[in-house]
Amino acid sequence: LHDALPISAKICNILLPLSIYYAVMAWSRNCGRTFWLLFPFIFFGAFQLVLLYLFGQSIIAVDMFLNLVTTNSSEALELLDNLIPAIVIVVVLYIPALILATISIVHKRRLSEAFIRQARRRTLYVLSAGILSLGTAYLTDNRYEPKSELYPANVCYNIALAFQRTAQTRNYHKTSKDFTFHARSTHQADEREVYVMVVGETSRACNWALYGYERETNPGLSGIGGLTAFSHVLTESNTTHKSVPMLLSPVSASSFDSIYYQKGIITAFKEAGYQTAFFSNQRYNHSFIDFFGKEADTYDFIKEDVGDSNYNPSDNELLKLVAKELGKGVSRQFIVLHTYGSHFNYKERYPAEQAFFLPDMPVDAEVKYKDNLINAYDNSIRYTDNFLVRLIDMLQEQHVNSALIYTSDHGEDIFDDNRHLFLHASPVPSYYQIHVPFFIWMSDNYRQRYPSLLEAAQANRQKNVSSSASFFQTMLEIGGVETPYRNDSLSVTSALFIERPRVYLNDHNEARTLDDVGMLKEDFKMLEEKGIR
């Protein structure tokens, strides 16, 4: 039950479903058959227990169902290894009950007619109490919605939404085929330009030395010139399949459903005359990340290059593709990289010989291994730091107008407080899942050619920024791409940048304020400590 619900709603959420289950069970003398007819709800209950084990709260969200489709097998196996306790609980609770129900059906066991008649008479009173509790919930909380708050009605509603979104996604190529940015370049054609957009994975700002973390997780970036780091940046989603498309397109939490009719930033740069490339260290997710990536002149999802689900290349493999692309010497180049960053299992994100913080094992998903998990996580950020420094060096060696922009799709919970939250993508986000790193690097040539953008970036670095709304817009301005979809009031390299109220994309694709998505006092305390409004 959600902590934000009034007591009347909590009572309703218990009483009404129980009354309906009671009525259904009283319908037949063969309880085993009825129990099996309720199997979909039993399955939801098992799924819910696993979710509670992972996140400690919240019902099965639309995004959870979509993750079943978009999460690849290697990611799933990494997580399943750490869900054994939850799976054991599910097996112990449900398998014996299903076996007993099967025995009841096979042996045609029946409850007595007298017992059933008495149970059916009670049904009227039980259902009346449930309906009365529903009315009370409506009267005492004007925001109460069964489709959002009442289990299992909310789960059924979310399933319907998941099917709807899956159908819309499959139809994307038809609904977006006529879209155009009407983009053009405002930069001089006789100057070579190279711009790189890096989308990180599961990296939270509070573990970056660039933002005051006490550990040396950014030994390379801390000494890089021309780098502007933005401190107060929040993502508008804690799920990869939503956050990354917002980074790569004009949509944000306030306009997310328009994504089915638009294309990504690669198309905008192509229209403006750039040679484009997209390189990813993640597998296909059969959704917008794939769609936007495949808009490029050259694209490669390197994990798909080998027919082995256990293939685990490091992010540094992407640098080989970047070097090859830069070697083409094209006058205008735009490269997008999607890394694997700090995705769990953290220890597998960097070579063992580069482990700096020890011990970094075992790293099972248990509170008692928190220190080991943090060590492994911080090692993965150091590896990201090295990756980004090498990438910047490659651009600097070109001696052209070049720039790099980086952020992460979302952060991560690592048993940080007494809630013992772990991982990300929970239906209710936490501070640790939404505060992300965001920085811009500009080459010497670029800073000399466009000094006003550097000045604006420096002026905006302590302002409140949404990565979901500003990443795309900032890249357009840096690359000199003019389009009706460009909005400089969202670009952190613009003097026109305007701070906006924080919003978050909830499970129903609605933009909600942070205090309306279920975040708790621990999260707001952390935001306040970081000076984030």
Predicted segments, located by residue:
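Transmembrane and membrane-interface helices of multi-pass
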Residues: 1-151
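Membrane-interface soluble catalytic domains
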Residues: 26, 30-33, 121, 267, ...
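Active-site-proximal alpha/beta segments of enzymes that process anionic O-linked groups
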Residues: 129-197, 202-364, 467-468, 473-498
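Active-site rim elements
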Residues: 146, 253-256, 308-309, 370-385, ...
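Metal-dependent active-site segment of extracytoplasmic phospho-/sulfohydrolases and closely related
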Residues: 196, 380-423, 472-476
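Histidine-centered active-site microenvironments of extracellular/periplasmic hydrolases
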Residues: 212-216, 400-401, 407-451
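Short beta-strand segments
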Residues: 278-280, 334-341, 378-381, 403-408, ...
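A long, amphipathic alpha-helix that forms part
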Residues: 320-324, 361-404, 440, 462
